[in-house]
Regions:
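Short acidic, glycine/serine/threonine-rich loops at helix termini
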Residues: 62-63, 67-70, 94-97, 136-141, ...
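Short amphipathic, charge-patterned alpha-helical segments
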Residues: 109-115, 253-271
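Ferredoxin-type iron-sulfur electron-transfer modules in oxidoreductases and energy-metabolism complexes
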Residues: 34-51, 79-81, 87, 94-101, ...
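Active-site-proximal helix-loop elements at catalytic-domain edges
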Residues: 14-36, 128-129, 136, 140, ...
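Short acidic beta-strand-loop surface patches of small beta-rich interaction domains
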Residues: 133, 242, 274-295
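Iron-sulfur-cluster electron-transfer modules
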Residues: 1-182
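Hydrophobic alpha-helical positions that pack around
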Residues: 136-254, 266
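Short loop-to-beta-strand transition segments
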Residues: 69, 124, 267-281
Length: 431
């Protein structure tokens, strides 16, 4: 096992196994809110510079430098400005933010308090998926604990449950939803830093991004920057699901490889071998065994032809139909398209129709080339990134597994790859 695998750094996951880890009492016993105490002795600009020095990058998928994002806010004019935490975790395979809030909500609340001081915000919002009522309740209970303990000062934190629309994970659609409107992506500029929630300067960050701020101030910017790679500093949560023996959350420095993470997850299930995997969830181009040793950082994964995204590492063995998996993803994106722009609204519909034909073994001559053409016409032409998310797995799937798409012209996927064989819960499966 390599040195980087050995040097796992449990910060966000530290204490997850503790008795009642979500309570304030448990969090304080683990050194909680010490970072906030330190931040309260610093000027806002100094806090921003500390985050810049740490090299922290956004964990919602884009990887934009967090401190730089905060610095885009215009000078304080004495009127409200807001922090919005994006907890609308809805993409297939992505499952790191919800467990963080469930097991350790105070690490997020402490990060919110530090960030709010940095941007001079007195009202922060956490936007949650509407389906996760239990998470909403746990977060609200933790906010109440911190408020009653006098840890938050005059900061008000509001948890808001959305209505279940995936599009509201897009930051400006989230703002529309938070304001009570139907979630639709907004035209940019103006960017949220200038005119966001209620047309006021707003910082929007992912749950993990804000939670990482806590660790930086509990330790130091230098400590954080010492982990990871030259351009992808620090550590993060890697969510491994699918055909491995022990799926779950693994907190490790950037630069760890998928081969090492699969080893940590107990390996591929017994008697099977890896076929393909996603480095950043269903919206990223798929990888195969050839990329197992690619360092999992933004630059290396990008150079290899995909995106790190939310680090949702879905693992599929040889019993899995690529066509079937991509069809399920396309059905999701077509259903979740907000309908605002033509490429996404019409394109995802036709992608789904063709994929369903291929899955059923009823593909028509020219379907594969048409599928690839539609995907390329959607990519880069939709109003937001949802269109790209639908197109990329199809383009990479055809490139890497064209023979399976060709088989869909005559043979149903269920005959080539029986459902029972790929089920984790079938006889001989993971469990």
């Amino acid at each position: 096992m390599s040195e980087i695998t050995v040097a796992l750094t449990p910060i966000l996951t530290r204490g997850w196994g503790s008795n009642r880890s979500w309570t304030l009492e448990s969090y304080l016993a683990r050194g909680g809110y010490e970072g906030l105490k330190k931040a309260n002795t610093m000027e806002p600009a100094e806090i921003v510079e500390t985050v810049k020095a740490s090299g922290l990058r956004g964990r919602g998928g884009a990887g934009f430098p967090t401190g730089l994002k905060w610095s885009f806010l215009p000078p304080d004019d004495g009127l409200p400005r807001y922090l919005v935490v994006n907890a609308d975790e809805s993409e297939p395979g992505t499952c790191k933010d919800i467990p963080t809030i469930m097991a350790n909500p105070h690490v997020l609340i402490e990060g919110i308090a530090i960030t709010s001081r940095a941007i001079n915000c007195h009202h922060a919002f956490v936007y949650l998926r509407g389906e996760v009522v239990h998470v909403y309740r746990r977060l609200m209970a933790a906010v109440k604990e911190a408020t009653e303990a006098g840890l938050l000062g005059d900061l008000r934190i509001t948890a808001h449950a959305g209505a279940g629309a995936y599009i509201c994970g897009e930051e400006t659609a989230l703002l529309d939803s938070l304001e009570g409107y139907r979630g639709h992506p907004r035209l940019k500029p103006p960017f949220p830093a200038v005119a966001g929630l209620y047309a006021r300067p707003t910082v929007i960050n992912n749950v993990e991004s804000i939670s990482q701020v806590t660790g930086i101030f509990q330790h130091s910017a230098q400590w954080y920057a010492s982990m990871g790679t030259e351009k992808s500093k620090g550590h993060g949560l890697f969510s491994i699901s699918g055909h491995v023996k022990n799926p779950g959350q693994f907190e490790a420095p950037f630069g760890i490889t998928m081969r090492e993470l699969i080893e940590l997850a107990g390996g591929i299930r017994e008697g099977h071998q890896l076929k393909f995997w996603t480095p950043g969830g269903s919206s990223t181009p798929i990888f195969t065994e050839a990329e197992l040793d690619t360092p999992l950082d933004y630059e290396s994964v990008g150079a290899a032809g995909s995106m790190l995204g939310t680090r949702a590492l879905q693992v599929f063995d040889e019993t899995t139909s690529v066509v079937r998996v991509i069809t399920r993803w396309i059905e999701f994106y077509q259903h979740e398209s907000c309908g605002k722009c033509t490429p996404c609204r019409e394109g995802t519909y036709w992608l789904k129709q063709i994929m369903l034909r291929l899955e059923a073994g009823k593909g028509q001559e020219g379907d594969i080339d048409l599928l690839d053409e539609i995907a390329h016409n959607i990519f880069g032409r939709s109003f937001c990134a949802l269109g790209d998310a639908a197109a990329t797995p199809i383009m990479s799937g055809i490139k890497k597994f064209r023979e399976e798409f060709e088989a869909g012209l005559t043979t149903p996927a269920r005959e080539l790859f029986p459902y029972e064989a790929s089920s984790n819960f079938a006889k001989g499966g993971v469990r």
